[in-house]
Amino acid sequence: ATYKVNAYQAARIVSSRSRLSIPDKVQSIRLQYNPLGNGGRYFIARFLYVEKRDISEHTYIELQGLGFHPLQINAFTRLRRLSIGVNIISGPTGSGKSTTLKNMLELLYEEKKKKVNIISIEDPPEYEIEGTAQLPVTNVETEEERGAEYRKAIIAALRSDPDIIMPGEARDAEVISLVFTAAMTGHQVWTSLHANSALAIFDRLKDQGVDDFKLTDPDLLTGLIAQRLVKKLCPDCSLSLSEYEAINGMIGDIDRKLIEGHEATVRFPNLNGCPECFHGYTGRTIVAEVIEPDYKFLDLVSQGKRQEATKYWLTQLNGMTMTEHAWIKMVEGSICVHDATVKVSHIDKISSERKAFLIETINRTV
């Protein structure tokens, strides 16, 4: 009813409320319509699928299935056990942030024996989240109205006696202020924003005017997470290096350098595919980094000592960068070197010492 030929428009189709014929496994479809200068149309449809899961399964299996490393899964477990604090998941659009948030809330609901009040504020709700009261943003026509209604919904949630609150996106300074207010008044908070790394979350918060005393308190700023999605190789038909080169020719010198010493374990896509995959791939997997900051880490970051803070995180807080996580998956053969380098940078900068540590983490979990 509101379709306009030459306007930029977004829409959402929900299977339970639509008269259209939508496949059973599709929960909703997010649409973006853009007019082109030549009179054409540029249309994007993002399908959100129903997630089949047994929440009685062990937490480790749930998050491992998404692609998180055991070190990161343990970190998430510790974060969920905290009674208060802000936990922020960052990444670009389409990096799986909503799926991770959904899993966190459902795991919290299960771990708290379903005796917990969890409220989310989403614009719009992308998935049904078991055990969560999901507040949508409604009755808006302009972006200004949308922002005001979103903030109003967060305030309403805070007045509804929540234990855990999840604003889907910390989209502006006012929302971020409400997020920290929620934590300071005794709530565990999960949210997301757009940042290129876990450390860059700190910069985004500072740019939005968050006070220094909040940014240097690890009891308040408890979790900094960044993630990407990388195409996952089909385990049934992926190719060894020699098989791939026999079909496609020699890989480049840069890629050969990146896999040096692990030629026997790396894998490549079979672009012809098999009955179990789509052109050599079976979905996507997460590469991530999770920081549980302490006073020293936040103090170093606040002083602008980024290299020292990163070194401290990696060596003293048992950290792992997103690039290192991608390297592990590449060495294990679950993602291809080509796909890894598209999603993360500086794989060639991982030191021999760090590689030895990462190999040790693989051996501990085999």
Q: What do the PLM-derived regions correspond to, one by one?
A:
Residues 5, 9, 25-27, 37-41, ...:
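Helical mechanochemical/support elements of P-loop NTPase systems and associated helical scaffolds
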Residues 64-78, 251-366:
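NTP-binding/hydrolysis catalytic cores, primarily Walker-type P-loop NTPases
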Residues 77-80, 87, 104-231:
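Switch/coupling sub-region of P-loop NTPases
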Residues 196-293:
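Cys/His-rich Zn2+-binding cysteine-cluster or related metal-binding knuckle/ribbon modules and their
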